[in-house]
Swiss-Prot record:
CDD domains: RNase_HII_bacteria_HII_like
One function term, GO molecular function aspect: RNA-DNA hybrid ribonuclease activity
Disulfide bonds: none
Compartments where located: Cytoplasm
GO biological process, one term: mismatch repair
Record's keyword terms, sorted: Cytoplasm, Endonuclease, Hydrolase, Manganese, Metal-binding, Nuclease
Enzyme Commission (EC) number: 3.1.26.4
A Pfam family matched in the record: RNase_HII
Protein name: Ribonuclease HII
Native source species: Thermus thermophilus (strain ATCC BAA-163 / DSM 7039 / HB27)
Catalytic activity: Endonucleolytic cleavage to 5'-phosphomonoester
Recorded name of the encoding gene: rnhB
Domain RNase H type-2 intervals: 15-201
Length: 203
């Protein structure tokens, strides 16, 4: 962020800026989680969650909660991803996160997510590398989703959800072929759709 944070022009105008980012868009299983964070103007140690170790993410998630003016999370379940598609489900999770925010932001920054909003919006690619607010949202979303996947690992053992977090790995592919899709797999994703059914279909 050598050129200054992405949200700096909004901060200079005195606007409350909410940063949003998601976790889980490309996973084969589990929800999409969107974090939203409002930070006061300043310099922060937050970086894209994908560049951090799990321990560092957990530590920084607590720091985000300490310094944020407000934060919230929104979730779109796997069944909603199947029904709506990835983009619309991500937008739904973002809407839920914003509705849960205890204050009203005056500008938004997202990581290339085209939110329909009347507010001033910046949504460049790789915003989580240029915006501490988006990076903070990324950290909260990733930590929350990882906890959900650890719980799903207990509910549906054998898939390795706690390790690969629902993403496509050789281990996950082998488990799908051996066990079939679980109720939290995204049936529209080709590797899942091609796996043999073992669980009963939801009504």
């Amino acid at each position: 962020m050598a050129e200054g944070p992405l949200e700096a022009p909004f901060w200079r105008k005195g606007l409350l800026v909410a940063g949003l980012d998601e976790a889980g868009r490309g996973a084969w299983a589990g929800p999409i989680v969107v974090g939203v964070v409002v930070l006061p103007p300043g310099e922060y140690p937050f970086r894209d969650s994908k560049l951090l170790s799990p321990r560092a993410r957990e530590r920084l998630a607590e720091k985000v909660k300490e310094v944020a003016l407000a934060f919230a999370l929104g979730v779109a379940e796997a069944a909603e991803v199947d029904r709506l598609g990835v983009l619309k489900a991500t937008l739904l999770a973002a809407e839920r996160a914003l509705l849960s925010l205890p204050l009203a932001p005056e500008a938004l920054v997202t990581d290339y997510l085209p939110l329909p909003t009347p507010l001033p919006l910046l949504s460049p690619p790789k915003a989580d590398e240029k915006s501490p607010t988006v990076a903070a949202a990324s950290i909260l979303a990733k930590v929350h989703r990882d906890r959900i996947m650890a719980e799903l690992d207990r509910l549906y053992p054998g898939y390795g959800f706690a390790r690969h977090k629902g993403y496509g790995t050789p281990e996950h592919q082998e488990a799908l072929l051996a066990l079939g899709p679980s109720p939290v797999h995204r049936k529209r994703f080709a590797p899942v759709a091609q796996a043999p059914l073992r669980f009963p279909e939801a009504p």
